[in-house]
UniProtKB/Swiss-Prot annotation:
It comes from Cochliomyia hominivorax. One of its GO terms (molecular function) is metal ion binding. PROSITE patterns: CYTB_CTER, CYTB_NTER. GO terms for biological process: mitochondrial electron transport, ubiquinol to cytochrome c. Heme b b566 binds at H98, H197. The keyword Nuclease does not apply. Its cofactor is heme b. Its main location: mitochondrion. The keyword Cell membrane does not apply. Belongs to the cytochrome b family. This is Cytochrome b. GO terms for cellular component: mitochondrial inner membrane; respiratory chain complex III.
Length: 378
């Protein structure tokens, strides 16, 4: 019997097994769309970034003006720049929803897939941070100064490490050049890590909303989920284009329209909105090293989930108390994002500290309450 080319061809067969003939659970909801949406975001970022890099100059005397030149003089440069900046915001919205789905439905039990996902999250956060420095506005410069300075909290090695990252005794031309280099290369490392993420996922198959084995009820990925994904693509792209064409600088910081000036500190230094929750956690610890540890742990704590799973069911769909706790945690993250944008004064400091405790408490108490609920129903 003649097999189709997509099965016979050595390269097409890989694509076929990932996108066409992949057996997928018949009942996965729209919450499973974010993986493909993230891939779309990554492609948008790589393509717009590639064209921006053709016109950008990584030099402290030229960087700000080169971004200005892109927006004013390059054909559709304004569109490339705003698509890239807002594309990053959509990337993080999709990542946070993707992670939230994984926590809710117990997808973290695919341990290798989950751990690679946590690594991807760190890589994407690093990439976005370095990208924010490139326009060399006030917030770019001071954001880079404050965040890189956190390395000095590391005992013994700290000061040397900071000067090594800076390439000197302050954030200067060497810093901008290396940040541009890393910002260019990291998305391709993210792309490679994404392929490993997908490889691990296809070893086990997808989870589903009821968390049971779905081998008896699988359907081919194409046409069912290709079309479902395309609907997601259209919706997200439309919202992104509307934002870019109506209010492209809504999510940015006005201070970044002022060229970087080492002699003038902005009133309130803050990162992009998608890092504010972690920034609020960092600020809520009144100790430099403690703050840095809390900052890293706010993301790294996701890696403990597969090893601290005590329930009889896969997700929290069948645990009413844990569902309430989950949504409290979601609201906590939103409130932390708001606190991160507020000045360091009362009552914001205290509220930030309370929210930080609630955030970390979720990961500690959630499995224990699940265990208690299981025992209650035995």
């Amino acid at each position: 019997m003649n097999k189709p080319l997509r099965i016979k061809h050595p390269i097409l067969s890989i694509t076929n097994s990932a996108l066409v003939d992949l057996p997928a659970p018949s009942n996965i909801s729209a919450w499973w769309n974010f993986g493909s949406l993230l891939f779309l975001c990554l492609m948008i970022q790589i393509l717009t970034g590639l064209f921006l890099a053709m016109h950008y100059t990584a030099d402290i005397s030229l960087a700000f003006n080169s971004v200005n030149h892109i927006c004013r003089d390059v054909n559709y440069g304004w569109l490339l720049r705003t698509m890239h900046a807002n594309g990053a915001s959509f990337f993080f919205i999709c990542i946070y929803l993707h992670v939230g789905r994984g926590i809710y439905y117990g997808s973290y039990l695919f341990t290798p897939t989950w751990l690679v996902g946590v690594i991807i999250l760190f890589l994407v956060m690093g990439t976005a941070f370095m990208g924010y420095v490139l326009p060399w506005g006030q917030m770019s410069f001071w954001g880079a100064t404050v965040i890189t300075n956190l390395l000095s909290a590391i005992p013994y090695l700290g000061i040397d490490l900071v000067q090594w990252v800076w390439g000197g005794f302050a954030v200067d031309n060497a810093t901008l050049t290396r940040f541009f280099t890393f910002h260019f290369i990291l998305p391709f490392i993210v792309l490679a890590a994404t392929l490993i993420h997908i490889l691990f996922l296809h070893e086990t198959g997808s989870n589903n909303p009821i968390g049971v084995n779905s081998n008896i009820d699988k359907i081919p990925f194409h046409p069912y989920f290709t079309f479902k994904d395309i609907v997601g693509f259209i919706m997200m792209t439309m919202i992104l284009i509307l934002l870019v064409l109506i209010n492209p600088y809504l999510l940015g910081d006005p201070d970044n329209f002022i060229p970087a000036n080492p002699l003038v500190t902005p009133v309130h230094i803050q990162p992009e909105w998608y890092f504010l929750f972690a920034y609020a956690i960092l600020r809520s610890i009144p100790n430099k090293l403690g703050g840095v540890i809390a900052l890293v742990l706010s993301i790294a704590i996701l890696a403990i989930l597969p090893f601290y799973h005590l329930s009889k069911f896969r997700g929290i769909q069948f645990y009413p108390i844990n569902q309430i706790l989950f949504w409290i945690m979601v609201v906590t993250v939103i409130l932390l994002t708001w606190i991160g944008a507020r000045p360091v004064e009362e009552p914001y400091v205290l509220v930030g500290q309370i929210l930080t405790v609630i955030y970390f408490s979720y990961f500690m108490f959630n499995p224990l309450i699940i265990k208690w609920w299981d025992n209650l129903l035995n």
